[in-house]
Amino acid sequence: MRNKSKITTLESKFPLLSIEQGCMVSKDAEITVAFRVELPELFTVTSAEYEAMHSAWHKAIKVLPNYSIVHKQDWFIKEDYQGKLSDGGLSFLARSSERHFNERPYLHHAVYLFLTKTNKQHMAQQSNFSSLCRGHLLPKEITNKDEVMKFMEAVDQFERIINDTEQIRIVRMTEDELVGTNEKGGLLDRYFSLSEEGHASLEDIRLGADLVRVGDNMLCLHTLSDTDDLPTTVSTDSRYERLSTDRSDCRLSFASPVGLMLPCNHIYNQYLFIEDSDANLERFEKQARNMHSLARYSRSNQINEEWIQEYLNIAHSQGLTSIRAHFNVLAWSSDKEELRQIKNDVGSALALMECHPRHNTIDAATLYWAGIPGNAADFPAEESFYTFIEPALCFFTAETNYKDSLSPFGIKMADRLSGKPVHLDISDLPMKKGVITNRNKFILGPSGSGKSFFTNHMVRQYYEQGAHVLLVDTGNSYQGLCELIHRKTKGKDGVYFTYTNESPISFNPFYTDDYFFDVEKRESICTLLLTLWKSADEHITKTEAGELGSAVNSYIELICADHSVTPCFNTFYEYLRDVYRKDMEKRDIKVTLSDFNINNLLTTLKQYYKGGRYDFLLNSDKNIDLLSKRFIVFEIDQVKDNKDLFPVVTIIIMEAFINKMRRLKGIRKMILIEEAWKAIASANMADYIKYLYKTVRKYFGEAIVVTQEVDDIIQSPIVKESIINNSDCKILLDKRKYMTKFDGIQAMLGLSEKEKSQILSINQNNDPNRLYKEVWIGLGGMQSAVYATEVSMEEYLTYTTEETEKVEVMNRAAQLGGDIETAIRQLAIEKRNNKKK
């Protein structure tokens, strides 16, 4: 038989009456305005920023009228990451990543703020007057409408003050968020079920003398309700030793040990009771006089008088507001052994704050009941202590989890605390918000810091989101990824250019799929031919440039009109030798050999014509139009020191990207230059690098340079002037080996002390149970954080630059007829199984 008496009892005890105009109204005619609070991300806040947040809270609270209650409630709920395994559109590596992170545990953090207007009598009530101890609650009527209006005006002012700060944002909660809808439970539902689930079901609540139980969960309550429980000094923040060095500081809020650092289900309640400060101080004056008159009878009276006098002296000399405060940690578990461990963990966390942990079993029921959103006025007065606003605010939590970027585009990184995946947009959203003015990136990381893993991880996700990616490499770092894409697209994409004696690198600058040659394409062909003809220190006259341009235009007209002529360097050379030279001789206005020596041009270019030593270079018969290819790798390690080949290869690369940049409207394009930039950034290419970095942003593009040597940055004016100054996104990896040189790096990159501290914390406190490397990402000097590059085994085998591992993958692929995806899948399974043994 259904027991209806319990339901009736719960209904009769329920302290809230209704939601009116967005405010919660209690049966005692008290109104509460509820907010969601957004805090800054963990490990990204400096001491000065903690001070600024503290100051903002203080200013906001000062505008509230007497007999107001500030109740901040932080929820920390253990959850598991749910991978998007049912998404049919995921690539092989994206699905592997989702599977790797699936069910990764983390602590979900949500912050709520409740501002309640009560009265003097109710604020002074003790636990025996709680609504739990009364009979049926008869709703009272709000009688003083003027007080309500003044309170609501103060709340508006409070909201404006907080939202004027850069670090904190508060948003009023709607009725649906508080009481829920048919589809989703509200905050009140979740409080009575102690869960953050979408639609929580109400649980039976047992409020016993020795135990509070909500459903299957047993509650454990630790309180800070007496000055004897508090530390001798408090501050807005404290040094987090695990991520600090002798040259840098990592700061966390004073209350962080009972926040995200406490890895269990818990709610951290922070109460401030704003009373009539002058009346409080008058009462303390009276108490001090009484204690003084009784001091001769008891030393404790004398000590109490000294404490009261000190409190009064500070209040009057510094103009501080006397308030009451209370803080508690409400943790729970359905398992008794786990609850015992949680009890110890909470006690240890409070001890880290130099507080004396007090496990409260006497008032647990009334404190749980007072924690109901909108029911702070039911708080038992004897559980609070007198203090001032400033020290009380030091017990407010001031940081939260890493947040996903509110953008459809981005890359997946991992939270450095729990390893939960974080969706991070470092290109579009920062541009839209004005944080950066270009999408260019500068990446600096020593060998072995995880640089190649990060860049592989980034470009793979850019490619999968529709970007055109062109990579210039010198160490086969992208061979695995390129081969995987080539195989997956059946050769339509994933083009890998490299030089070997058996298969030398070759191009065809005259080939296009559609016979379309715009001005930039024609100019790039002319630049290529001039580079082949003249050395870097030779002067090019206007006549020479003009005649060569005319020859190129005439040849292009020929191949567009007569498709039987194969577009390539050989046919161009023949046209120049057999047709254009004769046309020049027939002209009325002769061009002398001193103005344009076509014979010298033909002689110089002959080595690239069939039969010449470089006849392979510009006569590729593969007919690849790079404009349509979305993933291209130029591996130039073998040619970067060849004075004849390298300038040609460089121009081909640049022409390919500029062609994409100008012709692909509305499509993202990226050029990433690894260590090859040192060769490309030579004197004759300096102007191109400057041009690229300054103009690429106008074409929805981004240029990225990767380097590992600090000295390269400091010594190269091109890097300093063109690359660094035009890269609003800076990405740095482990810099511990350069700690003594870091001041030079900091000055060169224009890093703040905050950014320096973050960078020097990289890999200082890595979880030994997870395989990852950390990376610092800074955006325009305004936003920065350290993230983890954590990948699945499949991604690891694709990205690895370790020779033995690459050979293992390629050998397995060869055994499978070139199927690199199956090879990676098989090896990943084998390696995971070996780890389990």
PLM regions: where:
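P-loop NTPase motor core of the ASCE superfamily
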Residues: H100, F516-N570, P717-K837
